[in-house]
Amino acid sequence: MDKKYFFMTIGLTILGTAILFFYSDHFRAFTAEQARKINVLQESPIVPNVTFEDSKGESFTLSEYQGKYVLATFFYATCGDVCPVVEMNFNKIYSSLPKRILRDKLHFISISFDPKRDTPEMLEHHRELYEADGVNWRIATVPDQKELKLLLKMAGVIVIPIENGFEHNAAFYLIDPKGRLIQIYDYNSPDKVVEELNLRVK
């Protein structure tokens, strides 16, 4: 090989590696989802104190949980693919944690991003389906569209309308007692989430 092209190839390889190193956060982020999780760990953004409406039609805000952890996830009630898996695993986490932690230290919220269709009646059906107690695990939505968009953007939740539903990413989101998003968990690893929560929330 001509020396000129050899060194050019070497140079381009080094340049490409350097670019990948920079944009993948030191080779740690090779997908948007991984990058999102790393960003949360680095920044710990404050969660907007939006107003929720739960399955009983009652309004509440995250400020009510100040001093406690909150584990949240996002869904829409008519979802037929990923959401049932997410909620079943959410139930598995909830059922696996000590009652003392659930009573005093940690609350669960399943948040619908489809407030037009997910009325309190729909949310109540969802609550019964996944055996949420409606107290320590609430099923809710955010009626105000501006607040909902703000919340989704903060968490990096992508929601794309399609025929008869939405395409969206899914995960579990841990909010600390100061109202900061501090961890994003894989929804397919409920046992790991339980292990982590037992260590973190005491």
Model-inferred region functions:
Residues I158, I162-K202:
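Thiol-/selenol-based redox modules, centered on thioredoxin-like
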Residues P45-V47, Y65-Y69, R103-L106, D118, ...:
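Extracytoplasmic
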Residues E87-L151:
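Structural microenvironment flanking redox-active thiols in thiol-disulfide oxidoreductases
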Residues Y69, Y94-I101, Y130, L152-V159, ...:
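Sec/Tat-exported extracytoplasmic proteins
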Residues M1-N49:
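N-terminal targeting signals for export/organelle localization
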Residues F60-F90, I109:
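Short active-site neighborhood of thiol/selenol oxidoreductases, capturing the structured segment around
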Residues K37-V70:
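Short extracytoplasmic
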